[in-house]
Amino acid sequence: GSLAIAQLHHAGMRSPAQLIGHQPLCPSSDEETDSRAFTNSEVRQLRDDFVQAALLAKQAGYDGVEVHGAHGYVVCQFLSELYNRRDDEYGGSLENRQRLLVEIVDGINESCGNGFLLGVRLSPERFGIKLAEAIDTCEVMIDSGKVHFLDISLWDSFKLPAEEEHQGKSLLCHFAEIDRKDVKLTVAGKITNAKEVAEVLHSNIDFVTIGRSAILHHDFANRVMADESFEPIATPVTPGHLAEEGLSQTFIQYMGNWKGFVSTAETS
């Protein structure tokens, strides 16, 4: 069977004010998003809220949690030199910018125990995250001995890094070469068919993270294991197809925001 892992997420400055009912919060004030900076006590409360959320997930019967530290959300914002301009213990040096994530991981491990699966999602390059700093954060997580897996969202698993000094090998290779000890590594980013799954797994990656293709086919993993040449259905697909794959009407409506994913009308 499968494991149930809850992803813990706070959008920070990416939170829509009309949805949350107040001004978004960010490591440092941000004029573009009209976000104000967390106070020091609010940062500690944020940390405690992540820990409490993990504990609630455990009590609800989940096998583990993943802390979302990627895609420009709040943990990523703290890691980013671009968005984190704080002058307290949570800003400045990379070690200080990593502090919130380290404290969240420490708190979850202490509250939920080492038998409760704990993963961290990270992403390089965008939102001010430099590749070398992303790798350093991975190594900090590994050396802590408190995480079971790292989930690296690469945007495109097969592309070369954006930073010229790292372009001798793909983004995938940079992360696959990390000495991760007993920590498992998964990657995401334009892994869409059986051939690409195999290529990633043969690159010293423990498992793959699938988004779009798993939305198109709820049984994508089984199809890939049964057919090494499996290709998902071409997009756009009808709302009816997505309903048959188990998507709710709200989910289907949301997927309509993805350009070229859902057709505007059912075919006869």
Predicted regions and their residues:
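Flavin-dependent oxidoreductase catalytic cores
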Residues: G1-S268
